[in-house]
Each structure stands twice: as structure tokens, then as C-alpha cells.
Amino acid sequence: MKSLLGTKVGMTQVFTETGKAVAATVIYVEPNKVLAVKTNEKDGYSAIQIGYETVKEKALNKPLLGQFKKANSDPKRHIKEFRDVVAEVGAELTVSEFEPGQLVNAQAYTKGHGFTGSIKRHNFSMGPMGHGAGYPHRYVGSIAKGRGGSQAQRVFKGTKLPGHYGHELVTTKNLLVLDVKANENLILIKGAIPGPKGSIVLLKSAKKVGHIVSDPQVVNYLANKASSSEANE
């Protein structure tokens, strides 16, 4: 199981030999520094602890600074544990962990929209816009909770109402790695990834491969990438 933390740069497109444009997300991966190694004998599980995104010392408290000093590492903003990954303390995980043609899972927080109305949040229909309709064009309307008898005198949990929208942890599975630029610490992934520009993205090698890349143009593009990389070596 291969895992990396990266930063979403934005989206672009790559072109196949026939001129087909393929949408791609660009991820910048600063080398992930291994800070500690968890073992079954000592900790009850096997994992490695990595640090990502170098920051100034004044941004962290003394306990965290001591942890980084013990690992002989620069201060990092994010600390994450990866299970089923073998590495030594002080090692650096780079984009070279992945290769073109591989399928990965991308996990990130979606864009936050704050407190949002029911029309945008739940795709409700708007009220009548004709003359005499009054103000409530974007109101929720009746939520079908009556008074007395067999009808509930409360609002059920899960009722679709205005509220916080977005900033949810979402995993997009089986995304294709189009290209890996090791010199620039960049990785290009086919399709979209949750989150705004600058958000932190967790990349993992796919566990459950639901499909095989069947687009012949994309397959040829990956084959040409592989042959060119072998020629450069």
C-alpha cells in the first residue's frame, strides 16, 4: 500500500496523439518525511508517521518541535500515519512512489459553502415567481409536520433544511495516474479531485479496482510515456 500527502494545484489538460483532450488534476507533492515507525510489538499496530509541508518554528508548540527534533526533521504543518507502509525514520517519500498507468484513491475535503439555503444545498425547486407570489421565492415551505393526532409534533432528524454545506471528507476511487514529473514533484491524475486549490490531498494506491482503463487513446498515451521514460534512462 503506497500513500502520499500532496497539495492540489489546479486542473489542466493533456493531449493524446490524436488530439483528444483529457482533463487532469495537478498535485504537488513535497517529499513526505518519515518521523516515526509504529510496530506491533510496541504500539499494537504497524504504521509510519510522516510530516508534510515545512513551516517556521514559531508556528508550532514546544512538544511538536521536540518531536521533530527527535526525528531530525524540519518542522512540518501536517502529521499523518500511513498503515501497511514500510520505511525507515528519516526517509523521504516522493512522487516516484507512483507511476503512470496506476490507479489511486484521492481523499480530500470538498469546498466549503458555509450556511446555505435548501435550494442550493438540496436542489429544491424555487417558489412561484409570478406577480402576487410574495417574498418567499427561496423558502423551504411546508415540511409536513402536523399538530396532534397521529402526526409527529417535532422535526425529524435528517429533514432537508438550510444548514452547513460542503467541507466534507470525500474519497474518489480508481483515478488514473497520467504522468509523474519527479523533477518538479508533480503528479497528474485523470479527472477531478475534491477540494479547492491549495487543499491537502491524500493519495493511496487503489484497493478495489472496479474497472480497467479501456480508452485506447489514453492507453496509447500511457504507453508512449513509458517508452519515452525508458529511452531517457
Swiss-Prot record:
SUPFAM superfamilies: Translation proteins. One of its GO terms (biological process) is translation. It holds the Pfam family Ribosomal_L3. Disulfide bonds: none annotated. One of its GO terms (cellular component) is cytosolic large ribosomal subunit. InterPro entries: Ribosomal_uL3, Ribosomal_uL3_bac/org-type, Ribosomal_uL3_CS, Transl_B-barrel_sf. Part of the 50S ribosomal subunit. Forms a cluster with proteins L14 and L19. One of the primary rRNA binding proteins, it binds directly near the 3'-end of the 23S rRNA, where it nucleates assembly of the 50S subunit. HAMAP family: Ribosomal_uL3_B (MF_01325_B). This is Large ribosomal subunit protein uL3. It comes from Ureaplasma parvum serovar 3 (strain ATCC 700970). The lineage of its organism: Bacteria, Bacillati, Mycoplasmatota, Mycoplasmoidales, Mycoplasmoidaceae.
